[in-house]
Amino acid sequence: MSSPSSESSNAKSSPPKEEYRTPGLRGVKTTTLFRAVNPELFIKPNKPVMVFGIVTITMCVAYIAYLHATEENKRELYEAVDSEGNRYTRRKSSKWD
């Protein structure tokens, strides 16, 4: 029979084994359809692709804002013809002024 002191020394020297789970949904059993519909839950993030996407979306929004601003400026101008037949651009003014 072994002494209690030898059993306690063995228990202290070896750490308890713990099973660690993988973070997120990578360790969960799911269907192929769920993985195909929600790939962002299972794929490791790719920083260069994220940066490219953010820059692309920002440029698209800036371009749309630019088009909106230039179109708005064009609406305030119109082409007028004077009595001599010369064409010139003029800012629109209210009929009531």
Swiss-Prot record:
Give the membrane topology.
Answer: Single-pass membrane protein
Please list every transmembrane segment annotated in the UniProt record, as residue ranges: 49-69
Which InterPro entries does the protein's record reference?
UPF0708
Q: Where is the composition biased (Low complexity)?
A: 1-14
Subcellular localization: Membrane
Chain residue ranges for the region called Disordered: 1-26
The record's principal subcellular location, in a coarse class, is membrane
**What are the record keywords, sorted?**
Membrane, Transmembrane, Transmembrane helix
- Pfam entry (one): DUF4500
What's any one GO cellular component for it? membrane
Family the UniProt entry places it in:
Belongs to the SMIM8 family.
Its protein name is Small integral membrane protein 8
Q: Which organism is it from?
A: Xenopus tropicalis (Western clawed frog)
